[in-house]
Amino acid sequence: MASAMAGAGPAPGLPVAGGPVVPGPGVGIPGKSGEERLKEMEAEMALFEQEVLGAPVTGIPTAVPAVPTVEAMQVPPAPVIRPIIATNTYQQVQQTLEARAAAAATVVPPMVGGPPFVGPVGFGPADRGHLDSPEAREAMFLRRAAVAPQRAPILRPAFVPHVLQRADSALSSAAGGPRPMALRPPHQALVGPPLPGPPGPPMMLPPMARAPGPPLGSMAALRPPLEEPAAPRELGLGLGLGLKDKEEAVVAAAAGLEEASAAVAVGAGGAPAGPAVIGPSLPLALAMPLPEPEPLPLPLEVVRGLLPPLRIPELLSLRPRPRPPRPEPPPGLMALEVPEPLGEDKKKGKPEKLKRCIRTAAGSSWEDPSLLEWDADDFRIFCGDLGNEVNDDILARAFSRFPSFLKAKVIRDKRTGKTKGYGFVSFKDPSDYVRAMREMNGKYVGSRPIKLRKSMWKDRNLDVVRKKQKEKKKLGLR
């Protein structure tokens, strides 16, 4: 812009640095007073500042009109008084812009504080005024917003028995050397009675549950109030089987020193190794040692190494369970007890033998399993001279009018399946048996008249045949 202005020359009516105002054509310089010239210069400066700062410029007149025209072109006064443009105005504007850019680039991030401040669990009525003040509320809000709620984890062993800590303290005091990191006790500020969980912020507690305590800003609130906690259980209570072996393994893995194993032997004896005790506890005289659990009987295969070692639930399952005692009856009822019959139990325990029906006739014997299908106490009729068309259904339909009718069967050849011309009919009632013999003898069943006889199936049994032979021998018939 300056080069363009320098090449074109000063515009009429604009001030030149270090020189007078160039008047426009037709304007007489001697006719203007000093106040009018000052107003024209201020108007031109305002237009020039707008052009430099990038504001829209309506346009610069080529000639400066008379006094009324100058009053019409005046810009309304700005609320902030602007300095007069000098030769170093451009440099000042550049420095201001650079300072703003540097300030925007170097924005201070939110400050991250240290560990969160844990206030006292309870506070008195005198401290409520401090918490209700706006400064305390703002500080508490900023602390909750900026500080993470979780505390950094402390690197320490997961579990160190009390006996090992006592033995280690006695060993380090006697030897004068530092403790191993794995057996060092935690910081004293972290040692205290076991709590169910981390306490919440003091503002979340009800007003009646807050106990009087030190002021909010005091550092004494970091430690919990001193109370008399319950005595911790001595080492060896509830730790299960193989307690001494576990102590030796923990000491050997943590310290790796021979003195630590000696300290375990001292601590396992039951006497305290030194005055240093982590946490409050009762004296050893008040602690009642529990009896050691009885060793469980192990199977012979596990002892010989044939099977892998069993776990604790499996060992507990091997312990013989005591049987519940049987209720004893009163002494007066002892004589009324009846012993259970042993014969019935023996009969029930043995499987029933399958009956075998052995028949004998014409000097030969054979087994007939078809006789097992019939009732042994029935009254059976032999039916002869049956036609080839007669089957079990036809024979049963002919004798089914009798109330005690049981079964009817036609005997067939096993190889060909053809009928042999005879069959059997059984009844439960002997009266029906007699009626059937009288009424059905000679009647047509199928295409032929039926012939009925008394069945002799019992006479063909081997037992009956032998019995008859013995009777005949006694009578001297044969």
Swiss-Prot record:
Pfam family, one: RRM_1
Keyword Nucleus on entry: yes
Biased composition (Pro residues): 193-205
UniProt modified residues of type Asymmetric dimethylarginine: 151, 156, 166, 179
One of the record's GO molecular function terms: mRNA binding
GO BP term, example: negative regulation of mRNA splicing, via spliceosome
Chain intervals for the UniProt region annotation (Disordered): 1-33, 171-207, 317-354
Tissue distribution of the protein: Expressed in cell lines (at protein level). Expressed in heart, brain, spleen, lung, liver, skeletal muscle, kidney and testis.
Record PANTHER family: RNA-BINDING PROTEIN 42 (PTHR47640:SF11), TRNA SELENOCYSTEINE 1-ASSOCIATED PROTEIN 1-RELATED-RELATED (PTHR47640)
Assigned protein family: Belongs to the RRM RBM42 family.
Name of the featured protein: RNA-binding protein 42
Classification of source organism: Eukaryota, Metazoa, Chordata, Craniata, Vertebrata
